[in-house]
Amino acid sequence: MGKSEGPVGMVESAGRAGQKRPGFLEGGLLLLLLLVTAALVALGVLYADRRGKQLPRLASRLCFLQEERTFVKRKPRGIPEAQEVSEVCTTPGCVIAAARILQNMDPTTEPCDDFYQFACGGWLRRHVIPETNSRYSIFDVLRDELEVILKAVLENSTAKDRPAVEKARTLYRSCMNQSVIEKRGSQPLLDILEVVGGWPVAMDRWNETVGLEWELERQLALMNSQFNRRVLIDLFIWNDDQNSSRHIIYIDQPTLGMPSREYYFNGGSNRKVREAYLQFMVSVATLLREDANLPRDSCLVQEDMVQVLELETQLAKATVPQEERHDVIALYHRMGLEELQSQFGLKGFNWTLFIQTVLSSVKIKLLPDEEVVVYGIPYLQNLENIIDTYSARTIQNYLVWRLVLDRIGSLSQRFKDTRVNYRKALFGTMVEEVRWRECVGYVNSNMENAVGSLYVREAFPGDSKSMVRELIDKVRTVFVETLDELGWMDEESKKKAQEKAMSIREQIGHPDYILEEMNRRLDEEYSNLNFSEDLYFENSLQNLKVGAQRSLRKLREKVDPNLWIIGAAVVNAFYSPNRNQIVFPAGILQPPFFSKEQPQALNFGGIGMVIGHEITHGFDDNGRNFDKNGNMMDWWSNFSTQHFREQSECMIYQYGNYSWDLADEQNVNGFNTLGENIADNGGVRQAYKAYLKWMAEGGKDQQLPGLDLTHEQLFFINYAQVWCGSYRPEFAIQSIKTDVHSPLKYRVLGSLQNLAAFADTFHCARGTPMHPKERCRVW
């Protein structure tokens, strides 16, 4: 299915000697220190002057928007005499950008040996991974800062706001109401277990009572429609890949309780995670038995949970690995209900009953000619024997465990404590996130447009939209022009690629309606939610139900081409193949990615790279299967298809040969990360060329104070610094298994090793690590 993708970028150039050069940073450090001090003093005076006055509602790091720029003439070292001298920008915005870049760098490292260490060594040295984090990166820092803003606006109750916003604040307060959560203990969970047909391991005589009337179809439908848990069979509604103007029912293999199927087999660290997972299950069931005044019966609990783990292990074996699911055309099988039933009988499983029961929750009736799309054919073929092997008790224990697993965070501390060892084995962390951050994240992910409206009002300058739109036009134009360089693609395919690129629609910042006070759409979006400050667990169940049913209703609704696929308060960017649409939420439109107060070299190397990355997703190993209208269609000639695969194989091999010390020397999965690597490489290449074109057409950029770097060098340094970050070993191992992105370090090294322009810019001799003898290129 055409899923949304995340952000990334890439570029090219070739070079000269690898001898040690004079430091890029020498000579300007004293000036920079004085400027930073002056800027901070000026800010202090400004702040003191405004105390007591009403300040604008614009907050946070996106500041100095109206400042006057002041410039000092200076000729950077190493630039030919004939080249025009650039102006040095000394505004607070530029000084802060210079300080950030300087602090993040490690000038003792040779850029041609390890550019990631050169660009990020200072950042890595200064930042220790917080106890609550499994990874800590520039992205995480920006998210932390964004959450501080959200905390302030969610806790602000001085004035009555619109209903959607008030509901978000009520949900936040219920999450923060820890005294009530502790007082209620496990009772909210025990109450809901009765609704779902009981958890056999945590009750007596299930087999002889509730179990006698148990039906798999109805249980799966209940989990799907009321709790948004698509267990055993993943049924969901989405745009039809072959006709993006309509929605259709999809049937696919499900997710599992642990992040990757690989954790269910093999030894080493996988065994440790498995053992911790089993103990987690046993501990939760034991607590619930105690609270229900039942005997501990540790033998029964252990036996039941071992059976659950065995069942889930068989399900894991039945699933197809992600690296074998990249060809969406091969995955897609549309059929009627009769064919579905005849092909996948599952020992009497009634597909029509299951699907109709799910849809009945939103009062939708199946049509006689209703079609479904089956993605998970190999899984469904294997599922029949699994269902036949395990008892109703074990299957029900598993279904309810998946609901319980999802809701542990909504319960009292004693339940959270049961997952400590599991989280340590999986993420390397033993300390829970501070409560307010957990609650901010929860509310933002469940009420993204309500929270987004608060964030945009507080921290997003509206004029950013037009500037980003101009950057999109520039990068897209370069993508189209660059098609002429591709010898592996014939003219017919290039023409269709050009048409698709020019048809990509963009969404920037936020949907307009979330700020329109007279537009009731935002309030109507959450009209079915009614929260109580004392009922956090029940509030979370409401969100699950409303989310599930909002999705199910789409089956009979027209596809809205203007629908936003993500909220505004998000530090990320996305591409949707079904919509041929790129999205840049307000949360990512801030330094180091973007600011009107920093040189364009940084903007092109930041958000420009992200723009190129998302555009390139339309032509990666998944996006290439969709046409300009978002319909799955093979618009490629046989010649171009064959050569695309050959170009891609180069990248699969390149990234697959990176051995990651943090992940027990495991290699990056070149197959799983192919789409993101293609986008990274294409994104930085296009952004760099767009920057050079902008300058060639008369664009005047400024130098940053204290940094004797060319504009081109600043571009690449800012690109690399976007990815500064470090991992805990446990999470590194998990990332190798589950993340479709390469590790941060290899996102930088891999893309820049493939760019001749980078080697030229830093004068890297052929044969040095950053100027390899062979390079890969797709776009």
Swiss-Prot record:
Glycans are attached at residues 177, 207, 350, 530, 657. The record marks 73-74 as: Cleavage. GO terms for cellular component: extracellular space; membrane; plasma membrane. Its cofactor is Zn(2+). Predominantly expressed in testis. Weakly expressed in brain, kidney and heart. It holds the Pfam family Peptidase_M13_N. Residues 88-779 form the Peptidase M13 domain. Keywords: Coiled coil, Disulfide bond, Glycoprotein, Hydrolase, Membrane, Metal-binding, Metalloprotease, Protease, Secreted, Signal-anchor, Transmembrane, Transmembrane helix, Zinc. It catalyses: Preferential cleavage of polypeptides between hydrophobic residues, particularly with Phe or Tyr at P1'. GO terms for biological process: protein processing; proteolysis. It comes from the Eukaryota. The active site is at 614, 680 (proton donor). It is found in: Membrane; Secreted. GO terms for molecular function: endopeptidase activity; metal ion binding; metalloendopeptidase activity. Zn(2+) binds at residues 613, 617, 676. N-glycosylated. Residues 49-779 are lumenal. Binds 1 zinc ion per subunit. Residues 515-560 form a coiled coil. Its EC number is 3.4.24.11. Belongs to the peptidase M13 family. This is Membrane metallo-endopeptidase-like 1. It comes from Homo sapiens. The lineage of its organism: Eukaryota, Metazoa, Chordata, Craniata, Vertebrata.
